[in-house]
């Protein structure tokens, strides 16, 4: 049973001559890691903003647990490419910030924040200042903060796009570990083809002008990693390479058609 449903979603910004998204149908179910991939102009970020409730669709319906999505809510945790952390607070206060806004008592929210920091392998970082952290560590704090409120689904907006290649791979692997441990459904958007193929249980390819779904792939590479297989072995698997090259060809063809 799907937790999150998008039915015939369209989006058009005021003054624009064409919609940014048209007739999008998606569902996100338990233990699913749904990845949306597409070239510039395919509406990836707009799609995530609609699900997060930051903007309303022009048409169609978005529901979570059967209830319409109407504005932001704590049941949808969001991790941004820009870590959006509070530089004047320490790591613990940043992770506990949403719980503080919700009125959770200090001892309870700090205990939850420490639990989430341990989950993302930052157990010894609670008293660190944000400026003392690397880019990857900041993203771990952002992930811990999103999870602290125990959301029904986790939304990730190109979360590793600003990281170097080595740190990006580390964060991909950490995300799969967290996904396995928490069983949280994840919706992630990315422009990185290998990342999309490695992480997704379902990969949705978007075409631009207007953004629309052109292909869906059911994949198991991330599940294999979560089950204990090494990332190197998975990424050297001929089936992984074949899938990556197929997706690359589709993305390039969409870019050429929209040029």
Swiss-Prot record:
- PROSITE patterns on file: ABC_TRANSPORTER_1, ABC_TRANSPORTER_2, TAUB
- Locate the residues binding ATP: 38-45
Signal peptide location:
none
UniProt keywords (A-Z) are: ATP-binding, Cell inner membrane, Cell membrane, Membrane, Nucleotide-binding, Translocase, Transport
- Subcellular location per the Swiss-Prot or TrEMBL entry: Cell inner membrane
MF terms in GO: ABC-type taurine transporter transporter activity; ATP binding; ATP hydrolysis activity
What is catalyzed by this enzyme? Answer: taurine(out) + ATP + H2O = taurine(in) + ADP + phosphate + H(+)
Broad class of where this protein is predominantly found: membrane
Protein family membership: Belongs to the ABC transporter superfamily. Taurine importer (TC 3.A.1.17.1) family.
Q: What is this protein called?
A: Taurine import ATP-binding protein TauB
**Naturally occurring in which organism (per UniProt):** Pseudomonas entomophila (strain L48)
